[in-house]
Swiss-Prot record:
Main location: endoplasmic reticulum
Domain of life: Eukaryota
Protein name: Vacuolar ATPase assembly integral membrane protein VMA21 homolog
Native source species: Drosophila ananassae
Keyword Oxidoreductase: no
Stretches the record annotates as Disordered: 1-26
This protein's UniProt keywords: Cytoplasmic vesicle, Endoplasmic reticulum, Membrane, Transmembrane, Transmembrane helix
Family: Belongs to the VMA21 family.
Function description: Required for the assembly of the V0 complex of the vacuolar ATPase (V-ATPase) in the endoplasmic reticulum.
Length: 106
C-alpha cells in the first residue's frame, strides 16, 4: 500500500514539472515567433518605405534628376535596404541564438 501512495504522490509532482516544462517551451516558442515576425516585417516593409522615402522626399526635392533616374536610384536604395535586413536576420539566426540549445527529451 505504501508503494501506491508513493506513486500517486510522485505522479502529481511529475504533472507539475511537465506543466512547468511545457510553459517554458511555450515561452521560448513565443519569443522565437516574435523575433521571426519582426524580421519578416522588416524584410517586407523596409525596402518599400526606403523606396518611397528616397523617391518622394530625398531625390525629387534635393537633386535635379529625371524621373527615370529617380526611380532607378530609389530601387537601388530599396535593394540595399533589403540586403541589410536580410543580413541582420542571418546574423541573428547564426550568432544570436547561442543561449538556446536544443535539448533532447525522452
Amino acid at each position: 500500500m505504501s508503494n501506491k501512495n508513493k506513486k500517486s504522490g510522485g505522479a502529481g509532482n511529475g504533472a507539475a514539472q511537465k506543466q512547468t516544462r511545457q510553459q517554458s517551451h511555450d515561452s521560448q516558442d513565443y519569443s522565437s515567433f516574435k523575433i521571426v515576425l519582426f524580421y519578416c516585417m522588416l524584410i517586407v516593409f523596409l525596402p518599400v518605405v526606403t523606396f518611397f522615402l528616397l523617391k518622394g522626399f530625398v531625390l525629387d526635392r534635393f537633386f535635379s534628376l529625371s524621373e527615370v533616374k529617380v526611380n532607378i536610384a530609389s530601387a537601388v536604395g530599396a535593394v540595399v535596404s533589403l540586403h541589410i535586413a536580410l543580413g541582420l536576420y542571418i546574423y541573428r539566426a547564426y550568432f544570436g541564438a547561442t543561449g538556446s540549445k536544443a535539448v533532447k527529451e525522452d
